[in-house]
Structures are given as structure tokens and as C-alpha cells.
A protein has these predicted regions:
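N-proximal low-complexity "stem/linker" segments adjacent to membrane-targeting elements
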Residues: 2-57
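Acidic donor-binding segment of Leloir-type glycosyltransferases
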Residues: 56-93
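Glycine-rich, basic loop-to-helix element that forms the pyrophosphate-binding segment
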Residues: 94-111
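Short beta-strand-to-loop acidic/aromatic patch adjacent to the donor-nucleotide binding site
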Residues: 114-126
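Short beta-strand-to-loop element that shapes/binds the nucleotide-sugar donor at the catalytic cleft/hinge
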Residues: 147-172
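Short, flexible, basic/aromatic active-site loop/helix in glycosyltransferases
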Residues: 175-197
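A short, conserved alpha-helix in the catalytic core of glycosyltransferases
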Residues: 198-199, 203-206, 210-215, 221-248
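Active-site-adjacent helix/loop segment of glycosyltransferases
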Residues: 241-343
Length: 352
């Protein structure tokens, strides 16, 4: 076994760099590389163990360069056998249970291909061609900002998704009208390139360079829903694109878990990082005048509210020149209303 990764625990402060809070983990296998398409696959695991050999055979047939299987504890008895049978699979053994976003962050640190397809163990690829064809479709045939050939179209491309009953799932997420208890609504993509606020269930093909540049997922958020909301809002605020494609399709073998949109500390963190900052000209800031309403509505004591607000201000200041727009602009991609009106200060979020 080879132990990799930082021995740090996940920090309570908001990370400003991609990998400053990666946990410790163990890697087994993955010595071989299947191809040179530029696209690797990440397999996230939840629930019962599905037909793993069948899954890995399908991924081999698709021709992914590398396959990373993120294994929650406890480690399964057949890992050594599987790593010998499938030497292109890199088994990442977690020492503790990690959130969805933390698992994707960790997988990103384990591959060097420009594209990464995040999938679940209860999914199957239905259409889209092999890895080479999928990567080719996403190529922009332009140079990336570093002057290298092979730039890709967007931060994340979301495939069509089917239920276990072969029904098309509403995988587009759009902001809802203001003052609702729900924050997003699911729609089925009707055309190629339809925008989505975030990749549902974390599933999609990610541009690794763009992903790392925006900081990946915030590991301090434990709710998968608010991790995805934070990732999606930050991506759009910073000028990135998340869109759906109808040229790739995956199917669930069992129904995915429903999204838990409960509010709490994760919502407050999301609010401070994405909704509260004010964007002017070429930068953003979190003004002190936002603090009184945050204190009154956060249900926190003065000390905790000050600490969290100050932390949010520091994070916004450190990244202030990354902003390209404000929440109203993001909302205008789908709605005539304002996202800032729809996402109120903590404590007001459930008002009608």
C-alpha cells in the first residue's frame, strides 16, 4: 500500500487554495494507463456493492485513461483481487467518511488528465461513445490561457440522466422565483448546451484545470446540496460555465437519493461567500453593513457570528478579483428576477 495525500484534517476556515485541506488516504493499484484520450473516470461508491467487475469492464471498454474508485471505509475484502484483475483502476481507500465534494477534490488530485468524468457505482454509461469521442466533443480547438493547445469548452458538462425506469431525469438546476422555500428547480434539458446552476449529484465531465483554479468544492460544507450550490454559484460568479449535453447519457440502476435542502450553518456559509458580497467594476467585497442583519438572523451568538462573518470577509477579499458578475446577472441566465432577492439573509430563508 502507498499512502498519499496530506495528513491535515479538514480545516474549519474557508480554503483559498484547492488542495490545502486534503485528508490522508491510501492508494492501491492503478499502475497501468489504458489510453491517451485525456479523459479519466472517477467512480464514487454508495449503498450496496454493485457488480464491480461489470462496472470496471464497461470502463475498460470505454477506454478511459485512468479509473479512480473512491472507497469509503471500511475497506472491502476484494480490493487486492480487483486491483490485480484491473490494473488500470486506482483504488483510493478513505480512512474516514468524506462528503461528496471532498471525494471529488481528492480524486482530482489523483489524476493528471485534463478531463475527469465523475460517476456513481449505481450508474451505467448508455451512450456517448468511448472516452476519446467524449473528450473530442468537448475540445474547443483553441489554446488555453497558458498558451497550451487542447482547451475545453467549459468547467463542467452534465450528461443526460435516466432513472432505473428509463425516464429522463430533470438534471438541469435553475434558480427559482424569489421568496420561495425551495432554492432551485429541476428541469429536463431540451436543447444542447442548456445551462445548469450546478451538476446534479456531482455527475459530469469536469475540466480539471478550471476546477482547480476555482478551488474545487468547499470541504467545510458537509451538505452535498450546499456544496453543489456553493460550487455552482462560485463558478458562475467567477465567469465559468456549467452546461448540459444531449450527446452523452447515463442511467441509474437504483434511484438517486433526494436532495436535502435543509438550511443551517452550511446555508450561512454559502450566503456569505456567494450572495452577500457586492460586485463593483472589477472586484467584489463583503461590506460591514451586511453584518447587523447577518447577526440578527443567523441564530448565532455575537462571537460566532463575528468570527464567521470575518472569515467570509477575508475569503472574499483574497479572491476579490476573481468575480466577473453578481447574483443578479447569474439569475438573468434563467429568470427575469434577482437571485439576491431569492436568497435572503440567514434566518429569513424560509419566509414566504
Amino acid at each position: 500500500m502507498n499512502t498519499r495525500g496530506s495528513a491535515q484534517t479538514v480545516m474549519n476556515t474557508i480554503p483559498t487554495t484547492f488542495n490545502e485541506a486534503l485528508p490522508s488516504y491510501t492508494v492501491i493499484g492503478g499502475r497501468e494507463r489504458l489510453g491517451a484520450s485525456g479523459l479519466s473516470a472517477v467512480l464514487l461508491n454508495r449503498g450496496r456493492r454493485f457488480a464491480r467487475r461489470s462496472i470496471f469492464h464497461d470502463m475498460k471498454k470505454a477506454g478511459f485513461d485512468i479509473v479512480v474508485s473512491v472507497e469509503p471505509p471500511p475497506a472491502q475484502y476484494d480490493i487486492d483481487e480487483l486491483s490485480a484483475q484491473f490494473p488500470f483502476v486506482r483504488f483510493v481507500l478513505l480512512k474516514t467518511h468524506l462528503s461528496l465534494g471532498e471525494q471529488i477534490n481528492l480524486a482530482m488530485s489523483e489524476v493528471d488528465t485534463p478531463l475527469l468524468f465523475v460517476l456513481w457505482n449505481n450508474m451505467r454509461l448508455v451512450s456517448g461513445g468511448g472516452a476519446y469521442r467524449m473528450a473530442e466533443r468537448l475540445s474547443s480547438h483553441e489554446q488555453d490561457p497558458d498558451g497550451q493547445d487542447g482547451a475545453f469548452r467549459r468547467l463542467c458538462t452534465v450528461p443526460l440522466m435516466q432513472s432505473a425506469r428509463f425516464e429522463t431525469l430533470p438534471t438541469l438546476r435553475v434558480p427559482v422565483l424569489p421568496r420561495k422555500k425551495e432554492y432551485t428547480r429541476g428541469l429536463s434539458p431540451s436543447q444542447e448546451g442548456s445551462r445548469s446552476l450546478y451538476p446534479v449529484d456531482g455527475v459530469g465531465i469536469y475540466d480539471r484545470r478550471r476546477f482547480i483554479q476555482i478551488g474545487g468544492f468547499d470541504g467545510a460544507l458537509k451538505s452535498a446540496y450546499w456544496q453543489l450550490m456553493d460550487f455552482g454559484f462560485r463558478a458562475h460568479l467567477w465567469g465559468e460555465e456549467i452546461s448540459a449535453t444531449q450527446m452523452m447519457k447515463v442511467s441509474y440502476e437504483t434511484d438517486p437519493p433526494p436532495e436535502d435542502t435543509s438550511v443551517g450553518g452550511d446555508y450561512r456559509r454559502f450566503y456569505l461567500k456567494n450572495i452577500a458580497p457586492i460586485f463593483r467594476k472589477d472586484s467584489a467585497h463583503l461590506p460591514l453593513r451586511r453584518f447587523p442583519s447577518f447577526l440578527l438572523q443567523s441564530r448565532e451568538g455575537l462571537f460566532d457570528a463575528c468570527k464567521n462573518f470575518s472569515e467570509g470577509r477575508r475569503w472574499v477579499h483574497a479572491n476579490r478579483f476573481r468575480w466577473r458578475c453578481d447574483p443578479r446577472t447569474i439569475a438573468s441566465l434563467w429568470l427575469p428576477g434577482s437571485a439576491e432577492d431569492g436568497f435572503s439573509a440567514p434566518g429569513q430563508e424560509t419566509s414566504a
